[in-house]
Every structure is written in C-alpha cells, then in structure tokens.
Amino acid sequence: MKMVSLIALLVFATGAQAAPVASKAPAPQPAGSDLPPLPAAASQAATPAAASADQPATTAPAADAASASAADAVVDNAENAIAASDVATVHTYSLKELGAQSALKMQGAATLQGLQFGIPADQLVTSARLIVSGAMSPSLQPDTSAVTITLNEQFIGTLRPDPTHPTFGPLSFDINPIFFITGNRLNFSFASSSKGCTDPSNGLLWASVSEHSELQITTIPLPPRRQLSRLPQPFFDKNVKQKIVIPFVLAQTFDPEVLKATGILASWFGQQTDFRGVTFPVFSTIPQTGNAVVVGVADELPSALGRQAVNGPTLMEVANPSDPNGTVLLVTGRDRDEVITASKGIGFGSSALPTANRMDVAPIDVGARVAYDAPSFIPTNRPVRLGELVPDSALQAQGYAPGALSVPFRVSPDLYTWRDRPYKLNVRFRAPPGPIVDVSRSSLNVGINDTYLEAYPLREPDSTLDQILRRVGLGRGDDSVQKHTMPIPPYRVFGQNQLLFYFEMAAMAEPGCKPGPSTFHMSVDPDSTIDLSNSYHITRMPNLAFMASAGYPFTTYADLSRSAVVLPDHPNGMVVSAYLDLMGFMGATTWYPVSGVDVVSSDHVNDVADRNLIVLSTLANSGDVSQLLSKSSYQISDGRLHMGLRSTLSGVWNLFQDPMSGISNTAPTDVESTLTGGVAAMIEAESPLASGRTVLALLSGDGQGLNNLVQILAQRKNQAKIQGDLVLAHGDDLTSYRSSPLYTVGTVPLWLEPDWYMHNHPSRVIVVGLLGCILIVAVMVRALAKHALRRRRELQEERQRT
C-alpha cells in the first residue's frame, strides 16, 4: 500500500504540472547518424561536490512555497519508500557517456548546447544531482554573463564567470525529480558580454562545460504493468540509448524450429533497438532477477513457471518466479509449428497486441518478399524525397551556428552504374529573406559520409537594379529558395550512409555596437530528392564490407528467405547466443523479422544447398566447415587457420582481381593464425553447393569468441576495418585479407556486359587491347595477302597477253 500511495502521489504531482517541452539544442559535435548510447549504470553512493571559495558563483533554483512544499513531500515519500523497500539504485553518467564527444563549448554564435537522455518507463526518479566543471573566458563580465542550466526547460542553476579564476568546479546542483520525464534534454545556455564592443563571432567570449561532468540519478522500480501492448517494454525502452540485453531461456539448446522462432523474435527486437545494438544471452533456466523471454513448446517450459494451459499459439507475460519486479514473456504453443506462429504474432502483429497479459495468436500469412524491398533500404527505381527519410523538423536550422542537418539512409551496397556515372542529389533550400546575414560569405555545405561534395552561397547579392525593383514590388519572386543538382560519386555510397547539410552563416557588419538579429531560420526543402535510379544490382564477391554495412548478400531478401544458418549438431548456449545476436543485427539492418531463414545442423546442409549459408562453428566442429569453404583459399586444421595450396595459375588469376578493393592479395605465408584464446575469424567465399551463392563462416575456439565476433560486426565504428574475404579478430583488433577468387552476384543488361567485364580491371583492358591488335593485324595481313595474290595474278595475265 505504501508503494501504491507513493506512486499515486508522484503521478498527481507530475500531472499537476504540464510536461515541459524541451528546446531544440544543437549536438555538441556532428557525430553521424548514430544517437549517443547511454552506458550501463555504475551503482554507487552519490557524494556531494564541494565548491571552493575561489570558484564562480552559482545560483540555485527557486520555486514558490507551495510547489516547493509539494516537491519536498514527494521527495520525502520517495525517500521513505526507498528506505522501506531497499531497491533504490544510483546511476552515475558522465556527459561523455550521455553523448558529448568533447567539452560542450558555447560562444557568441553558438550559445546553446544540449544533451538528450532517457529514463526507463518502469523506473521512477527520486533524486538527482548534476556535478559540473569547466571553464569560462576571463574577458566575460561577471554581472552580465552566465551559463544557465535547464532540464526540460526547468531551471536548475546558473554559472557565473570569475575573471581571476577561469576554471570552475566541481559544482553540485540538486535537481527536483519532478523535472524528469521519459525523454529528457539537459541544456546549457550561454549569455555573454564584455567591456567595450566585441564581435561575438571572434571567439573571445566563450564558456565550456567538461565532458567529464556527471549526472547522478537515483531511481526505484515501479510496479510492473504486464500488458502485451507495451512490448517491447519492459525489455527495451526507446528513450534509453544504452545497448540492450535481453535474456532468452530455451529448454533445448538445439531445435531447428524453436531456434527459427527465437530468431524471428531476436530480429524483431533488433528492429526495435536499431542503432543501439542488442545482445541475447541464452540460459536454460530463468534468471534470478530481471526480465527474460522464454521460447518453447508448453510441455518443455521451465518447471518454475508451473503448468501453463495452452490451446494453441500463445503469448503470455507472467512474473519472474524469483523477482516480483521482473517479467517473463512466454512464446509457446502445443508443438513447434505453433511456437513459430506465436513468434510471428510479435514479429508481424505487435501493433495489434492487446492490453491483456495473454493472447492466443491466429496463423499469420506474411507473403513472399521480393529482392531489395527491405523497409530500411531506399528504393533505387525512383527519386526519393528527403522528407521520406526524416521528419521536416530535422531539415530546419536556426541561428548563426545551427550544426549539421543529418539525413541517414540505407541502400543495398551492390549498386553499379555504367562507367561510374554519378547519382543525382537535387537540393532545394531556403535562406533568410532580407539583409539578415552576409549572403556573400554565407553558404550551404553539402557532404556525404563525412566527405565534402559541394558548397552553395545562400543567395547572390542583389544588384542595384534588383534592389530598386524589389522596393517598388517588381523584384524576382521568392529568390530565397535555391535549387541545385549535384553529382554523388558511386564509390561514396555504402550500405549505411549519411547526407550532411551545414549552413555556414556570416553576420552582417553593423556600425558601432548595434546587435544584429540572432534568431532566424534556414531549411532544406523536404521535396529535395536523391536519385539512384541509374544503378543496377551487380557486384563482385566476396566482400565482407558489404556484410558489415548492410548484411549483404543475405539481406537481399528482407526476410532472409534465400538464406540458411548452419549450426553445430549440439551447440552450447554461447553459440546460440551468437546466432541470436546475428539475427538481431539482421533485423536492425532491414527493419524486418527474419521469418524466411532456415536453421539446420551441419548434417542437413544439402537440404539448403541452393541458399546463401551462414555458418557458426567452434573448432570442435571445424571439419564440417572446411568442406563449405573449399572454394576459398583458407583451410582449418588442428585449431589453426592457414592458407590452402594454390595452383600455378593463382598468380595469373590475381591479375584479374579488383585492384580498387583496397585489400592487397596475400601470399600463401601471409595467413597463419590460431583460433584459440579468444581469436575469431570471419571468412566469406562462394558456396561449393551452388554457383553464385555465398558462404559466410564465423569461427572461433569457443562460443565466447563467436559472440564477440558478432558484436564487433554490429558496431558501426568497426565497419571500415571489415573488408576482403577474411577478417581476424584479436579482441578489438581487426585484420583484413583478400586471397580467394572473385565471383559475380547479380546481373546487368546485355549492353552493359562489356563495361562490367572491364570495370576497374586495367589488366583486362590490356589483354583485350592486345587481342584486338592481334585481330586487326591478322585481318590486315590476310587482306594484304589477298591483295598481293590478286596483283600477282594481274601481272601474270598482262605478261601472257604481251
């Protein structure tokens, strides 16, 4: 009852005040499309930071007596609940862990910096503290300069400069727990002034907050709400940016149908978590604390759950037998086919799940997928509006230093254009109207994947005639809108991409100290388009970079219906966990459950011979893997990976390899590695069972090495290191090799075949050129011989007549 009363009081106190609307602050540094991960919390006691006497003055938040009393009552009740239940947890995050790439620096043109973070919906904040350190310019006037700290537009405190001591901190600010919502924004707003007249854009006036400043949050768990409609909660909360851990409980470590059902669930969770990443530890019993997902036939469920009455495919949420705050999701049925149906009920019917804690799932027909139709991939048969990729608000900027506007997009990486013809980016953007900024020095810079493409002035300065015509109402229409078409080189487009638009604004020179406008808006038109329609789907394999960036070639069909996973006959929990993590990676890549993938043991590979194969194995089962890698240049024996024997034609064949790959062809002695001690290998080659199909083998001495390899594959920071046909992972160190012959996946029209054959192969051009020369010489020799023979006959005939 005390807990219920506490919750009711907190809900009442929170409801009495409208949820604050967070202001939109620019990120401290444009850091790609990945949002900042929220790390695992460090549980420790909160310790106040004492401010020394020579540090800048701080101002504590003030509130009216009534609201302060209400807040104190809420906090007192929360503290009593903590003491009674002893379940309070203190989470300590540095600003760097919340997403700050470096110190949050503010100056004249960039006065606002902010960070976003989330509070899980099943947690209640009872107290919080912000501990800040940093520095402020000694040129600032203490009376009229300050950094104001707010949380969701609610005042927390103020930092004021001390010219004699530029650095400050650590300074501690208590935060009212009522200020917290599920999605929070912590803002630092800078107001500056100095003696005399100072141009705010010259960098003399500044303030910075260290990325090592800390936010301490104390939370208690709320009573669980077991409603299927809340999925993926409580297993995943979209407001929390940390990597997600979702335990799975399987009665049997290897059962193809149950593993297929589990893979569908893992890919759905991967689809929900997207960039955050997710891992699925596998257990045979329910964890003592927290949440878990149990998958299996009803008769084989853990005994701790009791006997569950099941009449068909069933989804059910029950309490963790060992933890009343934990929730166990049951995905079950009377047989294995019903378990698969139940998993599809989540994968394809999550939007229709009821508010109840139990549901009987009807059979679901999801239909067949077609190639390259993954929901996360942009179409390549038409121009795509930027407004289809991001909301309109993501294309709007404000002020002199608005930060980069990011438009992430994904595409199948096997794109090819005739003679490397570029793609088209049609950009429409709107500049501030009137004499607000110096348009001759202001521009829109456009890039892709951190590579500069083009810069356009915001607007050409008006001529004298234009100014006169504008004043009398005869000017050129809306010339604040510009339209440009720019090329995008095909080699700059990968599986995961990010278009960047940066408005570089220059202030107008004002006489004296007259301030110019500080609030104005720019935007990229949502009707701007990116056009990849001049491309074809064809590429040369193996290429592990395609796997790392887009799961290619397995994600050619979003449901992996042309792919199969090969596991050992008796995999342990770590191997199964690696399989689930890989399916989560596929779901995050395509945004679609892997309902079409088959799971087989090594004894049944021939049943899926016509599919692309993903093999996960340890050294104990490496004999089966060696047969599937017979078309590669690598062999596995006695726990070691080494280069296999190559024919005398290998050197000649290497002349016809792709020189633009960035990976050098290796000699037979270049690869010699043991796969023990945490070392793992990822090998890609053509399948010996079907021409044009791919085998991807993930190998290690134990299941832990396999699991680490999958986690490395899913981390975007490692994508540039994963290339070629072999990657060796020694912890976080990756080494790439290329040695195996290339093969072609995909087709092009007949008229493009010659260009494709010569593409990036100067050796082939030379050979074809030589053959052409030989052919021309042969034709000329034959023609000259015929001419000489005819001339000889003519001479003989003339002699006979004379």
From Swiss-Prot:
Q: Which residues lie on this side of the membrane: Cytoplasmic?
A: 786-802
Q: Key word Cytoplasm present in the record?
A: no
Task: Note the InterPro entries from the entry.
Answer: Cell_synth_B, Cell_synthase_bac
* Any GO CC annotation of this UniProt entry: plasma membrane
Q: What is stated as this protein's family in its record?
A: Belongs to the AcsB/BcsB family.
- Where does the UniProt annotation locate this protein? Cell inner membrane
Keywords, in A-Z order: c-di-GMP, Cell inner membrane, Cell membrane, Cellulose biosynthesis, Membrane, Signal, Transmembrane, Transmembrane helix
Full protein name: Cyclic di-GMP-binding protein
Say which domain of life the source belongs to: Bacteria
TM segment ranges: 765-785
Q: Please name the source species.
A: Komagataeibacter xylinus (Gluconacetobacter xylinus)
Q: How does it sit in the membrane?
A: Single-pass type I membrane protein
Pathway given for this chain reads: Glycan metabolism; bacterial cellulose biosynthesis
Q: Assembly and interactions? A: Tightly associated with the cellulose synthase catalytic subunit.
Annotated region (Disordered), positions in chain = 23-64
Q: What does this protein do?
A: Binds the cellulose synthase activator, bis-(3'-5') cyclic diguanylic acid (c-di-GMP).
In this UniProt entry, which residues form the Periplasmic topological domain(s)?
A: 19-764
Q: What is its main location?
A: membrane
Extract the signal peptide range. Answer: 1-18
Its taxonomic path starts at: Bacteria, Pseudomonadati, Pseudomonadota, Alphaproteobacteria, Acetobacterales
GO terms of biological process kind: cellulose biosynthetic process; UDP-alpha-D-glucose metabolic process
